[in-house]
């Protein structure tokens, strides 16, 4: 597993991964329209333009498996981590390996993460990496077109 800088070529892969209905359902808090390239490109332009963001491409067995990053959440002012792994890489420990390495590179603590309450796979990844549930909130999940429970986790 390798974490490297995101390249323009990676974006097409990330966009294709974002089209997966099962992945969208699990992630829940996704783009309004996962098929909207213009919105996707604008989001990534914003990510690239914000020097407080740290974003990496996850490479597994020589293939782009997904992305991982951290950002200052506008709703809390705290650093949050986020990741997306393509479905063809699920169940291989990719997310756990990537998150372990990524949080090891970040010196800032505490770190926060959010996950749909019923996304047990992602919750397990976060817990394996030392994150603890510290709260819950309700939020509108675009992928489900309804408000759902979201867990807030912290890594000290």
Residue ranges of model-derived segments:
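Conserved GNAT-fold acetyl-CoA-binding loop/helix
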Residues: 22-43
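Short, P/G- and charge-enriched loop/turn segments at secondary-structure junctions
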Residues: 43-46, 140-141
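Acyl-donor (CoA/ACP) binding surface of acyl/acetyltransferases
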Residues: 1-24, 55-156
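Juxtamembrane/interface motifs at transmembrane-helix termini
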Residues: 33-36, 45-46, 86-87, 118-119
């Amino acid at each position: 597993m390798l974490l490297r800088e995101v390249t323009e070529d990676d974006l097409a892969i990330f966009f294709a991964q974002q089209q997966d209905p099962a992945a969208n359902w699990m992630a829940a808090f996704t783009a309004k329209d996962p098929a909207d390239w213009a919105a996707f490109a604008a989001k990534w332009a914003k990510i690239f333009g914000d020097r407080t963001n740290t974003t990496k491409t996850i490479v597994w067995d020589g293939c782009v498996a997904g992305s991982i990053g951290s950002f200052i959440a506008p709703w809390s002012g705290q650093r949050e981590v986020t990741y997306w792994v393509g479905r063809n890489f699920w169940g291989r420990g990719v997310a756990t390996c990537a998150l372990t390495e990524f949080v090891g590179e970040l010196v800032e603590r505490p770190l926060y993460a959010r996950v749909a309450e019923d996304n047990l796979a992602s919750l397990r990844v976060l817990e394996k990496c030392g994150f603890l549930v510290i709260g819950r909130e309700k939020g509108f999940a675009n992928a489900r077109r309804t408000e759902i429970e979201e867990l807030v986790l912290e890594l000290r």
